[in-house]
Each structure stands twice: as structure tokens, then as C-alpha cells.
Amino acid sequence: MSKGKITQIIGAVVDVKFDGELPEILSALECKNGDNRLVLEVAQHLGESSVRTIAMDATEGLKRGDEVTATGAPIQVPVGPETLGRIINVIGEPIDEKGEVKTKEKWPIHRAAPEFSDQSTETEILVTGIKVVDLLAPYAKGGKIGLFGGAGVGKTVLIMELINNVAKAHGGFSVFAGVGERTREGNDLYHEMIDSGVIKPEGPGSKAALVYGQMNEPPGARARVALTGLTVAEYFRDQEGQDVLFFVDNIFRFTQAGSEVSALLGRIPSAVGYQPTLATDMGNLQERITTTNKGSITSVQAIYVPADDLTDPAPATSFAHLDATTVLSRQIAEIGIYPAVDPLDSTSRILDPRIVGDEHYRVAREVQKILQTYKSLQDIIAILGMDELSEEDKLTVARARKIQRFLSQPFFVAEVFTGSPGKLVDLESTIKGFAAICNGEYDHLPEAAFYMVGTIEEAVEKAEKMAKDAAA
């Protein structure tokens, strides 16, 4: 192992001079910073036996002349079933105070995307058990889903329900990468996962592995933590043949960290001050998220849109990779409908009769048409009232309100707060229920019967119970 000495430190960027052979680009170097092990990743060869590196932790306390050792390999992180229920950081160290993550294997975080010949070309729907998602914006196995939403509309609850349902319905594991998110939120998520049974702190049975690089971390760690999480997910796909769910919260912070590092490395910025390698960085991450002949990684990525500007290069670059978008709306959350998914704004590439079938496609489009008509009639209703509408429009509004309520659903992970048991609805029941409402088979039932139920049969039962209670 060749050794070198630090010659310059500028924030997160450290220059190291080697006497012997230069370490390769993207390989890891190690040095001591007080009692801590500091990992540096080689980013550039400067000539004159020097390399420029990015630090994965704070550089306070380092000084020129400190000794650095080349490891001869990229950053290696623990992978395998032992990571489930644990929290690790960008370099694979545990941050949950439960001791070392003892795994049989360690994998490098920089890996090539699967060969084209190994990728599966079949498009298959990943049934989530959440009605609004499965019907109107279905997820593809091995697809990439963008989750858009402001603060407090239920992104985290939706993510936890997806983790829970995939574990129940498919027996699959999930990996959660917290990229530049609030430490408090990361802590809350961990404890909520314990409360909802997704993570079992004592003993086996955990369904998720957590990889965190929070806002307080230096940009080097935030720019690499998504790759660490992805490597953990790739193990489950490639070695265990699993259908893995991979969550990134927030993909914008990955770009933001790349832009901070880029400036320190002396690259000339491109549009809006972002790094010139923006599309390449994003592509390297996204191309590894795919379905192979062994298993799949389906990723759900929370996307922060700076100043609500969808043309900003950071969100615009991630759009090119998405198969589906799930938009959470504050207006829907305000009327008490959870999950607060906007049925008209959310889209999916696989909502196509050749993939989902004619019946599913027809019902989804009919539901959207009724909701769109209701939306355009709302101004008239607000000004003139319902009585001024034609009989046909009154019927459409009544059905739309039932559909709107039927798109809500009690979640397993929210049982502790709501008191109502969670429901996982299969795709067939979802299509059948919405088709029946669109056809007017349940025009006689009150709209309240459709709120927070699973299948259409439960809505009928609820209506009967309401009628009995009213008669009593």
C-alpha cells in the first residue's frame, strides 16, 4: 500500500502527494483525524505525483504533512441480510450504536450498471396494495418513481406503507437512503419503523436497511450515500433474487452535494451554477436501478423542486429517468383524504392497455374523466350551488365524490394513530370496485360509506351499518 502526505486542505477537498505509485481515480484513501478514521476518495490526478480527493467526513483537525494510506480499492461497504434493521453511513460504519455490522461480504460502492443482455425486457406491474397508485399511476417492477410533495402531506407515511406492503405481499426487502435529509426526520423514520413493525430492534425479522448521510454531513458523504444504499440493494437483487424497493429521500440533495463538490474541485459550473457533470452523475446512479434476469430494484425517489420551478436543471434531469410520478397534493390532504395522491396529476408510463390490459386502462381513464369533469364544475357549484346543474352533471358530481372518497384507504402503518385496521387491496378488487362506481351500480349508497375502506364490499357493509345505526 503506497503512502502519501497531505499538501493542501480546502473544506471538503484534500490534496495528497505520493512518492510512489498514484492511487486510481475513485479509489479510497485513509488517514487518522484524531481518533477517527477519515476516508478520502480520489477525484483527480493533478500531475507531479499529487491527487485531489473528496473527504467523506469533516476535515477539521487535519493538517498538512499528515500521513495518508492508499487502500487500493474503492470505498467498500457491508452488504447482506445482516444490514436489515441497521443504520449505516456512507462508508458502511454503523451509526445506531449497536456495534459493527458483521457481514460475510463487502462490496465497492462504484459498480457498473448491469449488462444490456442481463436486463429483463418484460414490463410487469408492481402491485402495491394502494388503490389510487395501482389504478391510476401503477408502478413497474424495476421502474423509477418520483414522489413529489411539500412538507406534511404524507410522503413519509406513504413510503413506510410501501415498505410494509412490499414486505407482506412480495416478501421483499427495502433499502432507505436518506440523502441530505434532516437528522430529526431520519430519527423519526427509524422509530416509526420500529413502532409499525418494519424494523425489529431485537432479533431477526426486519424488512428494511437504512443508509443515512444527513444535512450536517460534508458534501462528499451526501454525494456518495445514495450509491452506498444502492449497493446494499443490489446485493439483495443479484445474490438473493429479490424484488427490492429502494427509497431515496431526497434525490435533489444528491445533485446539490455534487454541485458543492464540483466547485471545490475547480470545475467550471454550468447552467444555474450546477456541476457540468450533472447528467452523467445522475445517469450513473439511475442506470444501476433496473430489473435483471435475477430480480429487480424498484426505486421511489422523493424529489424536492426548488422554488417550485420544474425547469430547474436538478429536477429536470431526474424527470428523464422516471417511469411514474406520484404527486401528493395539499388540497386533497386538507379535505381529509389519505393517501393524498392527486389522481389527475400523477402519471405512469405503464398505464397502457398492452401492459395493464384493456379493462384496467378503460376503468382508469373513466375515473380520471369523471374527476376531471367534477373539477371543471367546481367553480359553477361554488358560485351557483348544486341545484343549477343538469341532472347528468349532478350524477357525475355524485359519482366523482364517491370515487374521491373510495381513493382513500386506511394504512397499516397509521393504525396506531387512526385506530382503523390497515387494508391491502389486490388489483382485481380495485378495478372491480371503481368500474362498479363508474357504471352507477352504487349510486344509491351514501358517499360517506366509501371513505376509508378497502374493497367495494366493505363500502356496502359500511353503508348497511350506517343505515342500521340511523334506524336505531
Curated annotation (Swiss-Prot):
Catalytic activity line of the entry: ATP + H2O + 4 H(+)(in) = ADP + phosphate + 5 H(+)(out)
Family that this chain belongs to: Belongs to the ATPase alpha/beta chains family.
GO MF annotation list: ATP binding; ATP hydrolysis activity; proton-transporting ATP synthase activity, rotational mechanism
Subcellular location: Cell inner membrane
Coiled-coil boundaries: none
Role: Produces ATP from ADP in the presence of a proton gradient across the membrane. The catalytic sites are hosted primarily by the beta subunits.
Main location: membrane
Organism: Pelagibacter ubique (strain HTCC1062)
A Pfam family matched in the record: ATP-synt_VA_C
EC number: 7.1.2.2
NCBIfam families, sorted: atpD
Membrane topology: Peripheral membrane protein
SUPFAM superfamilies, alphabetized: C-terminal domain of alpha and beta subunits of F1 ATP synthase, N-terminal domain of alpha and beta subunits of F1 ATP synthase, P-loop containing nucleoside triphosphate hydrolases
Name of the gene encoding the protein in the UniProt record: atpD
Name of the protein described by the UniProt record: ATP synthase subunit beta
Residues engaged in binding ATP: G149, G150, A151, G152, V153, G154, K155, T156
